[in-house]
């Protein structure tokens, strides 16, 4: 709506119906004062009324005020809530063109740029073009570099680069005829105009005329310039012209053909000549291997052309032929097979159908054709299908890279598809992948978070002899901790025995997990057993572990063993908070009744009395 309004207003002559009358110096001063106050207070409507009063008298305010007004009207961040952006921008356009026609010397170049910047944000290409044409018509020559880029952007965004071509030509004419170098369009503008000729208008005559204009202006073409011409020549089937372009690029020292080849592919696809498009891909591989530089956009354009023509067989054939030409050092992501299948996936076309066609033709597209499909499966959560495809890949003698394995294993663990994750890891081991550490940690962490200690134990047993995996004590600790947390203390104890049998050294965390597990199930005698083993190993006792032992032993009533722990703490100068264990005793053993004295209970009574004396318990 805004663009339409501005376009219509650009066709009218502003203030043409306002009768002219002369302002006295006093009136002009009063108007300027009112205008200044209106701008300060952001009263847009009042400021506009004052400007109309000036226009009615065929006059204009002070230069500074005039530029401030137009800048205010153009602002996208104007705080005036009473006037819409559409109205303000319309008024900015009208006032600017009026000043250009009336007295352009009052208009600052930066003010014109501000207006055009706002038109760009409003996507108003029609008024922007009209404003520049008004400047030309009234010989108000603003340096091209102040407005050219803005006009190109707004025209390109609206798909009207062809409209920019007229302004470009006029600016070239002015620069030459008036000998004004600052009006010369630069290379960016020349390429935009060339894009309009080649891509939008597809006019050979206009394109060649524009190249001549560039030569007159001294603007040297770049790779993009040749690319636009290559598109047009391919679109028209002018092979000789393309050969001339390549020779010219060689003469000018352009080594890369990436843009040229991409543009040729685009032109051939647009004309329906898919065979020639395929030839460009293969030709690029015969040269310096620039197929690896083709963008995703180019591959999507190529694939779309083949799919619309129902030529999947030809697409598969292209992959096979390209695979024969690609060097062994070609990166997976840079292969033609990867580019084509990845484009299929992006366009929503089944990449698997390409694989089926490759198999039907008895050819190979290399590992690159599989990677996009695997990534798509992972993104969609189809991890079991991805794993099945990996099995097929391995059986064909191909090998995936570590990053692809990592991605698939992470996706499988996220989906809780532990079977697929473990299967993929086994495949990694069998294919002799050098780095297994990251995937190993991913699986162990995921199984721990999901409380699957039995799978963790099986996994560790399976991989612990593999030199590429470092199984350490903390891995066993994680398994023991998970078993204890889920109440499976028998399994935790068995894992502990297995750990020590394999000569992995238990540490404080190992014992803490076991103690906390037994305490939660009130199996305090097991803590006594652990203490005996700990003491026999002559392991180093730390404060947290001593606290865990004492807490469990006091709760269980094993005061003799508790005294051993206290003695060890004193020996190692570990602080023991006796008030804490006094509280634990009073909480758990306050109803303790000594049985009738018997010979076999005497030792227990002695330990109880000794502990009470140590903790200063008088009851």
Curated annotation (Swiss-Prot):
Check the record and name the InterPro entries matching this protein: Pentatricopeptide_rpt, TPR-like_helical_dom_sf
Top-rank lineage group of the source organism: Eukaryota
Q: Which residue interval is the transit peptide? A: 1-100
Please report the residue spans annotated as repeat (PPR). 186-221, 222-256, 257-292, 295-329, 366-400, 401-435, 436-466, 472-506, 507-541, 542-576
- Matching Gene3D superfamilies: Tetratricopeptide repeat domain (1.25.40.10)
- Location in or out of the cell: Mitochondrion
Its cellular-component GO annotations read: mitochondrion
Predominant place of localization: mitochondrion
Q: One Pfam match, by short name?
A: TPR_At1g68980
Query: What are the protein's UniProt keywords?
Result: Mitochondrion, Repeat, Transit peptide
Would the keyword Repeat turn up in this protein's UniProt record? yes
Keyword Acyltransferase annotated: no
Q: Which family does it belong to?
A: Belongs to the PPR family. P subfamily.
Which NCBIfam families would you find in this protein's record?
A: PPR
Q: Would you tell me the protein name for this molecule?
A: Pentatricopeptide repeat-containing protein At1g68980, mitochondrial
